[in-house]
Amino acid sequence: GAAAGASNSSALAFGGEVAPPTGKTESYDGTSWTEVNDMNTARYGQGGAGTQTAALTFGGTPPETGATESWNGTNWTEVNDLNDARQLGGSNGTQTSALLYGGTPTPGGTANTESWNGTNWTEVNNLNTPRWRLSGAGSDNTSAIAISGRNASWQAAVESWNGTSWTEVNDVNTAVIGSGAAGNQSFGLKFAGETPAPAQQAATEEWNGTNWTEVADLSEARDRPFANGSRSSALCSGGYPGSGTSPSWNATEEWSLTDLVGSWSTG
């Protein structure tokens, strides 16, 4: 699934990899989750952008789709599709200015990038490193960072988007797939994800526009969480705990930055 929202007290989570894939949508007010109207197309592995009351979702599977839907705070409406159907790409932005990059079904991941202007998707310049199961953060379709992921192997690579092209910047400390991300091109977070071993991660890294720094861990290790917010106020909810029964299936954790020190707390 995917998420939208500006902070740890205002979020929208939609879709997800359950059996069968779901179109369910839930809204978070900082205290509790409330079910609202479903998406038109049930799916997982899609992109997400926007806020709790003005969101966008695009792509996903099964099968790989280019379907795009817009949320007005009450209902989802089908709008113009992606040019290339795909799942498990990185995404960021707003309901009217969004970006999607990477993903599958191309073997080893695609480098394709598409930009949304509120009406149509346009193919723009590709990532330098093709990959899938990456994460992304950014304010709109002119400013983004593409984080980690994999192709033939796990990638620590990070790329910065300026509205025209991608530039390689400093790598994350730990290469992961299926991580959550929040923030923007200059101030961001990467959290959770999966490594070859010991698999699901609780690690969090903070981005200052130049370097990544390891900071406080999540309470629950997981990958593929719903993620939204900013570097100072982020939300990590749901996700895959790896095996067995775990609170990670529905656990919500809130990130807060106080006096330049960040920490997670149970939502």
Please annotate each region the language model reported.
Residues 1-267:
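Polar, enzyme-active/binding microenvironments
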